[in-house]
């Protein structure tokens, strides 16, 4: 299960934050990602840490969710992950929560995601029949 996640580090490195309007470079070079070097000083390091580099190796079904108005991580990161998996004929379902952020704040969305997590895990871990939304999503 992948939620509101980064798929392609180089593209996020070279993007503008929806929150601040500033570059995302600081996250990588001196903060959260702790890369300590620029993309241009350590391209291989960025690629090595980027899920987009390894997407062909995915073997398990993936449930991806994102908030459509996420100011932290552009929802296009989740969409790109989904599209890559679909193109590679991997089993994947994408959930897009409209008018939600990086964290789901609406009770309705939280409950929905909880039940979908539950359905997903029961289907894949307990080998029970899939919920209708899973069947539709995997087509």
Q: Positions of the model-derived regions?
A:
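Active-site-proximal cap/loop segments of hydrolase catalytic domains
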Residues: 1-139
